[in-house]
């Protein structure tokens, strides 16, 4: 008899965490949700009004302004860009949705950069 021990899939655990978090927070027109998605190569941020189901501002490593540097440096630039675009549309306060990721590394760098550039959360 062979016993197989399977390791849990990290992304499935993250998605489970994210669903649990999303049940507790929602973005409105007054205070939209700043959502983060992190892949192996890039990081994506969106400011979302969940009531209307509309993305109000977004930035990612696919943007032309973000091209060089380490992944953490790119996350800092993405945080700056999404904050500037949100402030330009009159958004100053957001609800931070870390997407089930730990508040560490690239996620923390993006959040700190967004705070420094005018978003409050």
Swiss-Prot record:
Pfam families in alphabetical order: Ribosomal_L18p
GO biological process: translation
GO molecular function: 5S rRNA binding; structural constituent of ribosome
Iron is among the record's keywords: no
GO CC entries: cytosolic large ribosomal subunit
Keyword terms: Ribonucleoprotein, Ribosomal protein, RNA-binding, rRNA-binding
Family membership: Belongs to the universal ribosomal protein uL18 family.
Protein name: Large ribosomal subunit protein uL18
Source species: Streptococcus thermophilus (strain ATCC BAA-250 / LMG 18311)
């Amino acid at each position: 008899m062979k016993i197989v021990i399977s390791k849990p899939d990290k992304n499935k655990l993250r998605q489970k965490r994210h669903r649990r978090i999303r049940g507790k927070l929602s973005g409105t027109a007054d205070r939209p949700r700043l959502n983060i998605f992190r892949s192996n190569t890039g990081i994506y941020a969106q400011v979302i009004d969940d009531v209307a189901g509309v993305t109000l501002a977004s930035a990612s490593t696919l943007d032309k302004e973000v091209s060089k540097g380490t992944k953490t440096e790119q996350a800092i630039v993405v945080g700056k860009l999404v904050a500037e675009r949100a402030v330009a549309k009159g958004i100053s306060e957001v609800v931070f949705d870390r997407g089930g990721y730990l508040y560490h590394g690239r996620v923390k760098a993006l959040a700190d950069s967004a705070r420094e550039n005018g978003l409050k959360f």
